[in-house]
C-alpha cells in the first residue's frame, strides 16, 4: 500500500531544479518509507530506472563499482546485469540502503558530473562513523529528510479531512466542545498508531490495536538490532528505552548516567550522538538566553530526548509487557489512562515541530528563593522574536512557567501559547490552542 507523502513533492522539485548537478539522498530512520517513496517516484517520473538495493544485491552488481574510471563500461555492465535499458536524461538510478556500500556513495561525484542520468540514494544510519570513515562524502549530494508520516499525511491515508482543520484555524474562533472532543479523539488515534507506514497500513486494513502494537514492536526490535551493531554492549538501546521514563519524571534534562550508569563520559557522549544520528530520536536543547538567539545559545550539555514517532513512544511506554492490550489503547483514545500523560503530548508536539523543519529548543531557569525551576517546553523563532509553547494534557492549572517567561522576556516574545486538549481561546496574553491546530501555528 502506498501513501501520499510530502517527500514526493520535494523530489519533484529536486528533479526540476537540481537533478542535473546533484544526486538526492533520502535520509531518515529505518522503516519511515524512504525506499517506497523512491521507487514510486522512479516509476512515475522517469522512462526507466535501475534499483540497486545494497541489502540484497548480487556480487556481480557490486563488482561494477570496483572501477568506475570508464563510465561507459560501468553503465553497460549495469544494464546487462539488470536487463534494464537506460535512456540519457530520462532514467534514474537508485542506490537503496547506500550506507551498506559506501563505495557507491563515493562514486556519486563522478556519476553526477557525467550528466547522463539522475541519481537517488536512500540511507539510514547514514552519518554513523563506521559508514563514512573510509570515503570522501560527495558535495554533489542534496539531503532530504524523511520523517514518519505527519498528521496531514495520516489524515490523507485514513480519509480524514485535514483541510477542515485549516479552515478552523483560519476562522480564529472556538469550534465548540463537542466538535473539539471529536477532533481530539481523531488526533489520539494518530498518537496511538503513529506515523510509521507499516503501522498506518495495519490500521487502514482494520487491524486491532494489539496487532498494530506488534507491528510497532517489530520496528523497535529492528532499531535495537541496529543499535547493537553500533555498540554491542546494548548501551545505545538502554539510552533509547530510557526516554519515556526521563520525560515522565519531568526532569530538566536527559541524564545519560541514569540510563547506562556512570561510564567514560567521552564514550557515553559518542553513543548519544550515534543514537541521534540514527534519526530515531529528537534532541531538544536548552537555550540559555532566548533574548540573543536560540541557535547561538544552545547548551549541548542540557537537552531532552523525544522519540521521532509518537506511536512508537506509546509502545515503548508499555514495552515491559508482551503486547500492549487493546484495553490500554481504548483508554488512551478516550483519554482515561490513569497516568498523567503530559509527556506523551510533549512528544507529539516535538514531532510536529520537527517535521516543520525546525530544531527543538526549550528554556529552564532557577526560581528565585527556591530549589525549583521554571521551564517552558518549546521555543521557536519567528523573524526577530520567539514564540513560546507550554504543553498541558488537560489545559488546567496555573501555567506559572510560561507566564513568568512572558514577564522575563516581554521584549522578545511574539506569541505565547498554551497547547492542550481544550478548545481555542485566550487567557490574558496567553493564547490557548488545541493540539490538532499546532501544525498551523508553526508553518
Predicted regions, residues:
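Short glycine-rich substrate-engagement loop in P-loop NTPases that contacts/grips substrate
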Residues: 56-89
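Short regulatory helix/loop adjacent to the ATP-binding pocket of P-loop NTPases
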Residues: 110, 127-143, 155-160
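Conserved lysine of the Walker
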Residues: 34
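A cross-kingdom feature that marks ATP-driven nucleic-acid transaction machinery
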Residues: 15-16, 22, 31, 40, ...
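Interdomain hinge/linker elements that couple catalytic modules in large macromolecular machines
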Residues: 159-345
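Structural recognition of the conserved hydrophobic beta-strand(s) that form the central parallel beta-sheet
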Residues: 94, 118-124, 145
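Hydrophobic anchor at the beta1->P-loop junction of P-loop NTPases
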Residues: 26
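Pre-Walker A adenine-sensing motif
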Residues: 2-18
Amino acid at each position: 500500500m502506498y501513501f501520499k507523502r510530502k517527500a514526493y513533492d520535494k523530489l519533484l522539485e529536486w528533479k526540476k531544479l537540481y537533478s542535473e548537478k546533484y544526486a538526492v539522498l533520502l535520509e531518515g530512520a529505518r522503516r519511515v518509507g524512504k525506499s517506497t517513496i523512491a521507487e514510486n517516484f522512479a516509476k512515475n517520473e522517469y522512462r526507466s530506472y535501475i534499483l540497486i538495493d545494497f541489502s540484497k544485491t548480487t556480487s556481480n552488481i557490486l563488482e561494477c563499482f570496483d572501477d568506475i574510471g570508464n563510465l561507459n563500461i560501468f553503465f553497460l555492465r549495469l544494464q546487462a546485469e539488470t536487463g534494464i535499458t537506460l535512456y540519457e536524461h530520462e532514467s534514474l538510478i537508485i542506490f537503496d540502503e547506500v550506507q551498506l556500500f559506501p563505495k557507491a556513495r563515493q562514486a556519486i561525484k563522478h556519476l553526477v558530473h557525467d550528466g547522463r542520468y539522475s541519481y537517488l540514494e536512500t540511507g539510514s544510519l547514514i552519518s554513523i562513523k563506521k559508514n563514512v570513515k573510509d570515503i570522501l562524502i560527495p558535495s554533489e549530494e542534496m539531503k532530504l529528510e524523511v520523517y514518519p508520516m505527519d498528521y496531514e499525511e495520516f489524515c490523507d491515508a485514513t480519509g480524514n479531512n485535514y483541510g477542515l482543520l485549516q479552515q478552523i484555524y483560519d476562522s480564529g474562533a472556538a469550534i465548540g466542545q463537542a466538535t473539539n472532543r471529536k477532533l481530539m479523539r481523531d488526533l489520539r488515534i494518530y498518537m496511538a498508531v503513529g506515523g510509521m507506514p507499516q503501522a498506518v497500513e495495519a490500521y487502514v486494513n482494520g487491524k486491532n490495536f494489539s496487532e498494530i502494537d506488534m507491528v510497532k514492536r517489530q520496528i523497535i526490535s529492528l532499531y535495537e538490532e541496529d543499535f547493537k551493531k553500533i555498540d554491542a554492549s546494548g548501551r545505545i538501546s538502554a539510552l533509547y528505552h530510557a526516554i519515556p521514563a526521563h520525560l515522565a519524571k519531568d526532569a530538566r534534562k536527559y541524564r545519560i548516567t541514569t540510563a547506562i550508569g556512570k561510564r567514560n563520559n567521552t564514550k557515553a557522549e559518542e553513543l548519544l550522538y550515534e543514537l541521534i544520528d540514527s534519526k530515531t530520536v529528537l534532541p531538544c536543547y536548552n537555550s540559555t538566553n532566548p533574548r540573543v538567539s536560540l541557535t547561538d545559545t544552545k547548551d549541548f550539555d542540557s537537552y531532552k530526548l523525544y522519540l521521532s514517532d509518537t506511536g512508537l513512544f506509546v509502545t515503548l511506554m508499555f514495552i515491559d509487557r508482551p503486547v500492549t492490550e487493546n484495553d490500554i489503547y481504548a483508554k488512551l483514545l478516550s483519554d482515561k489512562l490513569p497516568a498523567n500523560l503530559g509527556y506523551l503530548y510533549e512528544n507529539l508536539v516535538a514531532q510536529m515541530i520537527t517535521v516543520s523543519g525546525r530544531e527543538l529548543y526549550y528554556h529552564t531557569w532557577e526560581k528565585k528563593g527556591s530549589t525549583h525551576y521554571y521551564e517552558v517546553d518549546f521555543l521557536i523563532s519567528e523573524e526577530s522574536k520567539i514564540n513560546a509553547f507550554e504543553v498541558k494534557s488537560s489545559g488546567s492549572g496555573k501555567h506559572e512557567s510560561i507566564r513568568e517567561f512572558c514577564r522575563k522576556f516581554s521584549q522578545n516574545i511574539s506569541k505565547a501559547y498554551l497547547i492542550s486538549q481544550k478548545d481555542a481561546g485566550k487567557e490574558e496574553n496567553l493564547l490557548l490552542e488545541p493540539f490538532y491546530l499546532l501544525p498551523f501555528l508553526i508553518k
